[in-house]
């Protein structure tokens, strides 16, 4: 099912406006609209309710044209549990991440779409698979993503990544201002950690615990 955004902006808040557009197109009922307008403590949507009600749906994004958010759990994305655990280790997530689905053109297969997750500060981050994996800030919040679509800087950051112009998202790769505060980056590489000891192929099993301990790189790029 596709959710088509209308043009009417008659509600007071962006959350209620988005809900009204969904309802206008017959996508969700009154109860669903009430859920969409209810704020979580950080001012965003209640993620648990959002995931429960929208799971399995393509939600059209206002920008760019043809892009959708397919709401699903991490099991329906290309990422493995190892990749998600290492994604959480990036400073930009502040140690918390909730995968909410995939973003991309509606006709693309799941593994060709970026994986979207909500970080501790409420921002929406996209995990991109490339020669060197990277994470890009897609929106300042989930309500903003649904209301406006991807940030216009998103594709500029993807291009910077392709040109090798990003920093790594671990603590050693961070930039700080004169007061020692971390300068927020809109995109960063996912560092591929080095093996701390030799692994003998065929004789030693590579486990999730080894990955989480920082002994092996992404499961997608061995």
From Swiss-Prot:
For this UniProt record, the keywords arranged alphabetically read as follows: Activator, Host nucleus, Ubl conjugation, Virion, Virion tegument
| Any one of the GO CC terms | viral tegument
The record's principal subcellular location, in a coarse class, is: virion
Q: What does the UniProt PTM comment say about this protein?
A: ISGylated; ISGylation regulates UL26 stability and inhibits its activities to suppress NF-kappa-B signaling.
- Indicate whether Ubl conjugation appears among the record's keywords: yes
What is the annotated localization of this protein?
A: Virion tegument; Host nucleus
* Described function: Plays a role in the inhibition of host NF-kappa-B. This inhibition affects both the canonical and the non-canonical pathways. Blocks the induction of host IKK phosphorylation. May also influence the normal phosphorylation state of several tegument proteins including pp28 in virions. Also suppresses virus-induced ISGylation independent of its own ISGylation.
Query: Could you give the subunit structure recorded for this chain?
Result: Interacts with UL25. Interacts with ISGylation machinery components ISG15, UBA7 and HERC5; these interactions inhibit global protein ISGylation.
More info = Isoform 21 kDa is first detected at 6 hours postinfection. Its expression increases at later times, when the additional 27kDa isoform is also be observed.
Assigned protein family: Belongs to the herpesviridae US22 family.
Q: What is this protein called?
A: Tegument protein UL26
The protein's organism comes out as Human cytomegalovirus (strain AD169)
